[in-house]
Amino acid sequence: MACVPNKPNAPETIELTEDELRAIAGYAADCASPVLTLFERDLPSDTRPRDAVDAARVFAAGGPRTGALRQSAWAAFKAAREPSLSPAAADAARAASHAAAAAYLHPRASAHQVKHVLGAAAHAARAEELASAAGTDGTAGGAGALARARDHAPAAVRTVLGRLPVAPPGGGPVGALVRALDAALRT
């Protein structure tokens, strides 16, 4: 592994192929998609999170990594900040944002990059936890979303995680979900 030039104490780079990026983006879209309805219940006419998931799917299927894809991630992130949203809906939008942003994972051996690989899954699980606690979805909470994310992770997700340090501490409830999923996928 080579160090990133001109940056003291920069993390080493890792191998990261375009096929792996596409698989990770598709996985992230699959994780975010089931919770989109939580957002759409609160703001039915706001398509930003769904557009972000759709853009991630286009990239995963072989489409180009464009500025529009990056903008869809930012738009979903901004949608999560709408004041009228329930906490579950906000995390659903964050899951969508992470799905589109997964195409921009950096090839750095940094624990922070784990959050980019698993962020959509963790935010989707948190959205389900919050919706379940509020009695608005009929799911068993975030455990179901984490189990789905673990069981449906493609080989590329596990392979890339194996090149990265373990998920970092912190990040509140979503950070705890990232660490739990990271640990489950490394076993």
Tell me what each language-model feature is.
Residues 109-187:
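Preference for long, well-ordered alpha-helical segments
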